[in-house]
Amino acid sequence: MFYKIKNIYFKIIIFLIFVFKLTFSSSYAKDNSLLLMITEKTCLICMVWEKQIGEIYPKTEIANKFPLSRIEMKDFVNYSKHELKKTNVTPTFIFIRNNNEQGRIEGYTSPEMFWWQVDEI
């Protein structure tokens, strides 16, 4: 009987380690990857993107790899988390992984074009 109790505790510990590792791994990936959207409150194209893509983006597979983070253009000028080249276009989407720019999309024309550009990155 003591052996069975010991075996159950062992299985529970292994299970908890597995769950912890799985949780830690996925949050680690999210912390090191993001999609930075540079926007402005008065940007009409940004508003169109929000309506057409912004509402569904969090539900997509790419959002698991690159969670969306928005920043105003005026704040991007002083943004120093990552060394990124400047932009004068809103919206601009910068894909960042491990503090390095993986790709960027400047502007927005349509959902089809946006997803095509995302696939290219």
In which residue ranges do the predicted regions lie?
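N-terminal secretory signal peptides that target proteins for export/translocation
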Residues: 1-8
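Bacterial N-terminal signal peptides
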Residues: 11-23
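Thiol-based oxidoreductase modules, predominantly thioredoxin-like and allied folds used
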Residues: 38, 62-78
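Short active-site neighborhood of thiol/selenol oxidoreductases, capturing the structured segment around
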Residues: 31-41
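Typically the conserved alpha-helix immediately C-terminal to a functionally engaged Cys/Sec
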Residues: 47-62
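Thiol-/selenol-based redox modules, centered on thioredoxin-like
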Residues: 110-121
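Short pre-active-site segment immediately N-terminal to redox-active cysteine/selenocysteine motifs
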Residues: 39-45, 89
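A short, hydrophobic beta-strand/beta-hairpin element that forms part of a small beta-sheet core
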Residues: 90-103
